[in-house]
A protein has these predicted regions:
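Extracellular beta-rich ligand/substrate-recognition surface
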Residues: 5-12, 93-95
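Conserved hydrophobic/aromatic beta-strand scaffold that supports enzyme active sites
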Residues: 5, 15-17, 98-100, 130-132
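Short N-terminal binding/cap micro-motifs at the start of the first secondary-structure element
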Residues: 10-15, 38-41
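Glycine/charged-rich beta-loop-alpha catalytic/anionic-binding loops adjacent to active sites
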Residues: 81-82, 135-137
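Glycine-rich beta-strand-centered segment in the early N-terminal region that forms part
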Residues: 21-36, 45-123
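Extreme N-terminal starter segment of soluble prokaryotic enzymes
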Residues: 1-3
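Residues that act as N-cap/strand-start positions at coil-to-secondary-structure junctions
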Residues: 12-15, 85, 125
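A structural motif shared across PLP-dependent enzymes of the aminotransferase-like
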Residues: 121-135
Length: 137
């Protein structure tokens, strides 16, 4: 399956081959037919990832506070390792899509295979061939 990912450290975008999602309880697997690219929202995400570490810190003081709290709790080196690890994890882009239900998880029986649906939610309704989406999104 193909999915648009962004590398947070460098800001680079890639269309990557990733494993297909499977339905779990409370949601459905959807084969995307279309996904929305927002010139505003996604530009902000892309611009943020392209900033230096200092630029990211200036832009997101809430994350700086989380890092400082982690340093107090866990120490400097474990925090540095956690931050670098998170920066190396690519993130899926997108938050709005439409498609056809392929699989239904337990607790989402109001949907059925073949249903056409609109989906929303960052981290769920991404630019990908297929997505797993909780039933309320």
């Amino acid at each position: 399956m193909r999915q648009v990912l962004q590398h947070v450290r460098s800001g680079a975008l890639e269309v990557a081959d990733v494993p297909e999602p499977s339905s779990s309880s409370g949601g459905v697997t959807v084969r995307n037919v279309a996904s929305l690219i927002s010139a505003g929202t996604e530009k902000v995400t892309i611009d943020f990832a392209g900033k230096s570490l200092l630029g990211k810190a200036k832009e997101r003081p809430d994350l700086v506070r989380q890092v400082l709290d982690k340093v107090r709790k866990d120490g400097l080196m474990p925090t540095v390792q956690a931050v670098l690890s998170r920066l190396d994890q690519p993130i899926p882009l997108g938050y709005s899509c439409a498609g056809v239900v392929e699989e239904v998880g337990r607790g989402a029986e109001e949907f059925g295979p073949g249903d056409r649906v609109a989906c929303a939610g960052m981290g769920y309704a991404s630019h990908a061939s297929k997505v797993f989406v909780p039933k309320n999104l």
